[in-house]
């Protein structure tokens, strides 16, 4: 059935490059370094710039003690710091254990200990939960990043003022290090090392199921899993290329979000517009502002879209693809989306 949706000139088979997730991104970066890789509240980064940032962050994690095969838990929304960390850790050959930042603290503890993470990247908004369970986990070092770190100057200051009380980081605990200091100090101290170019078939990413059929499970995914998804998408979405734009509303702690809105996007050489939290009321203005050429979502996202303010008057000619997954899209909703 899939063949009916594939361009007649596209090959029905493909080879998966024998590289890591970082290796796939590097192919795009080497091919078009000046193309936009991601955008975040108006802050833009090209592929060439992103590659440099990944190497710097990779050096910082290595200096912190992360090595090939280590598990690093990431407790973050869709931010540049989270995405850079995923590819930086993949460059080392470490395994990213990605957890929903709104998980209850006992769930966070369980996920961390289930993979034996010695290192944690957390959003500042999760610090209270992390502090409550840190002594009961395997974590030795905590890197704290803020959703405001990569925002434009004025927006960053406003975010800091708004959240300064609720996002307090323990001042007297040496296990914590802020993102800016982490990158600046540790990358400067990193000794030369040869990043792994090998496939880690055991696991590159660990995600967690929702527990709909029982106890939530750890889902281990390899570099090849993600790269196969990327190559399949390149063939299926045959007219997507450099300059296209994906609205990354689906979260990175879900396979659909990390796989399509981030990794597949980078395989295309397209731009991922990172949205850290979904606001249904602002969905119409978000679409109008960014004009994505591709939209990937679950049915509830499309329900929010058709009911959002300003959508009825919006010219959707910028949109090449609207793809729904994760659940059945009801026919009445499909008709509204296509109207």
Model-predicted segments: where are they?
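Short beta-strand->loop structural element characteristic of the AMP-binding/adenylate-forming
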Residues: 73-75, 82, 86, 90-125, ...
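Conserved AMP-binding A3 loop
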Residues: 46-48, 204-228
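AMP-dependent adenylate-forming
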Residues: 2-6, 23-46
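Conserved pre-ATP/AMP-binding loop-to-beta segment of ANL
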Residues: 167-208, 215, 238-245
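Conserved structural elements of the adenylate-forming
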Residues: 51-56, 184, 219-241, 249, ...
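Conserved AMP-binding/adenylation subdomain of ANL enzymes
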Residues: 227-245, 253-294, 308
């Amino acid at each position: 059935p899939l063949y009916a949706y594939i361009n007649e000139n596209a090959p029905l088979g493909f080879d998966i490059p024998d590289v890591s997730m970082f290796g796939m991104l590097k192919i795009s970066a080497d091919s078009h370094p000046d193309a936009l890789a991601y955008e975040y509240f108006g802050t833009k980064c090209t592929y060439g710039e992103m590659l440099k940032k990944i190497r710097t962050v990779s050096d910082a994690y290595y200096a912190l003690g992360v090595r090939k095969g280590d598990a690093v838990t990431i407790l973050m929304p869709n931010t540049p710091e989270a995405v850079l960390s995923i590819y930086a850790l993949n460059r080392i050959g470490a395994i990213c254990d990605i957890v929903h930042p709104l998980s209850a603290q006992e769930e966070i503890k369980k996920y961390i200990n289930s993979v034996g993470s010695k290192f944690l990247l957390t959003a500042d908004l999760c610090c209270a939960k992390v502090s409550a369970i840190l002594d009961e986990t395997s974590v030795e070092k905590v890197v704290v990043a803020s959703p405001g770190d990569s925002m434009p100057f004025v927006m960053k200051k406003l975010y800091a003022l708004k959240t300064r009380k609720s996002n307090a980081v323990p001042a007297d605990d040496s296990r914590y290090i802020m993102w800016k200091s982490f990158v600046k100090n540790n990358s400067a101290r990193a000794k030369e090392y040869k990043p792994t170019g090998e496939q880690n078939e055991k696991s590159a990413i660990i995600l967690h199921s929702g527990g709909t059929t029982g106890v939530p499970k750890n889902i281990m995914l390899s570099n090849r899993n993600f790269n196969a998804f990327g190559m399949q998408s390149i063939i299926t979405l045959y007219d997507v290329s450099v300059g296209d734009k994906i609205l990354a509303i689906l979260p990175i702690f879900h396979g659909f979000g990390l796989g399509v809105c981030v990794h597949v996007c980078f395989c295309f050489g397209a731009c991922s517009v990172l949205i850290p939290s979904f606001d249904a009321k602002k969905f119409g203005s978000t679409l109008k502002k960014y004009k994505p050429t591709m939209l990937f979502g679950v049915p509830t996202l499309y329900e929010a879209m058709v009911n959002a303010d300003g959508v009825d008057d919006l010219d959707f000619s910028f949109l090449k693809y609207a793809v729904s997954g994760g659940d059945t899209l009801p026919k009445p909703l499909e008709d509204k989306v296509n109207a």
